[in-house]
Regions:
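A structural signal for small-residue-enriched, beta-sheet-centric alpha/beta enzyme cores
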Residues: 141-145, 158
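A generic structural motif
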Residues: 88, 144-147
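Short beta-strand-turn/beta-hairpin segments enriched in glycine/proline and small hydrophobics
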Residues: 126-138
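Loop/turn positions that initiate beta-strands
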Residues: 101, 151, 155-157
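Electropositive, beta-rich accessory/interaction domains or terminal extensions
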Residues: 1-122, 131, 166-180
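Basic (Lys/Arg-enriched) interaction patch that binds polyanionic ligands
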Residues: 156-165
Length: 180
C-alpha cells in the first residue's frame, strides 16, 4: 500500500446554477512533503467545514484503482489525481478491505479511518453534471475519510502500513451499502 499523490486545493468561487459557490474540491498534486495535522493537510482548504474537513474528516483518501473505470465511464482519459477532491490518492486500499477504525501509518503521520465519503453537490459542480452525485454513490467507489491520530508529514511514494484493526468493525463498503 502506498501514497501515489498528495493533493491540495484552495477555495474557489465558481458559478453553478445561477449563483457563485465556494468550494475547495479542486485539488492538484503537490510536490515534496506536506504536513498533516489534526484538521488536515497544510495548504489545503475547505469552504464548508460543516460538511467537509474538521477532525473526523481531516484527510480524504481515494483508491487509484478506481480511476480507470471513471476515465472510461466519464469519457475523460486525462482525469488526474485529486479529481474527486481527495487529499491522498492511494494504491492498495479499497473500500471492501478497509474497516472503520483502521489505524494506518501514512508517511510519518498516523490516521484512523472514520467514514466513507458521501457525495455532495460540489462533486456535481466540479464535473458540471448534477447526476454525478448519483453516479458516484451508485458506483460504491466512495473513498474514505480519516482523523489524524499523530501529526506528521506525507509525500507521494510513501508506504502505508496497517497498524491496527478491529476485525468486527464494518468495512467502508459495508457502510456505503447501508447508506446508498
Amino acid at each position: 500500500m502506498r501514497v501515489v499523490s498528495v493533493n491540495l486545493g484552495r477555495i474557489r468561487e465558481v458559478p453553478w446554477r445561477g449563483r457563485l459557490v465556494r468550494s475547495g474540491i479542486w485539488k492538484e498534486p503537490a510536490t515534496g512533503r506536506v504536513r498533516v495535522g489534526s484538521l488536515g493537510l497544510e495548504g489545503d482548504e475547505q469552504a464548508d467545514r460543516a460538511v467537509h474537513g474538521g477532525a473526523q474528516k481531516a484527510v480524504y483518501l481515494y483508491p487509484l484503482e478506481h480511476y480507470p473505470a471513471w476515465r472510461e465511464e466519464l469519457g475523460m482519459p486525462e482525469l488526474g489525481w485529486g479529481a474527486f477532491g481527495e487529499n491522498l490518492t492511494c494504491e492498495g486500499l479499497l473500500e471492501t478491505d478497509v474497516h472503520i477504525g483502521d489505524r494506518l501509518r501514512v508517511g510519518t503521520a498516523e490516521v484512523v479511518i472514520t467514514q466513507p465519503r458521501m457525495p455532495c453537490s460540489k462533486l456535481g459542480m466540479k464535473f458540471g453534471d448534477a447526476r454525478m452525485i448519483r453516479k458516484f454513490l451508485a458506483s460504491r467507489r466512495s473513498g474514505f475519510y480519516a482523523s489524524v491520530a499523530l501529526d506528521g508529514d506525507v509525500a507521494a511514494g510513501d508506504v502505508i502500513t496497517l497498524l491496527g484493526r478491529n476485525p468486527a468493525a464494518p468495512t467502508v463498503r459495508d457502510v456505503v451499502d447501508e447508506q446508498a
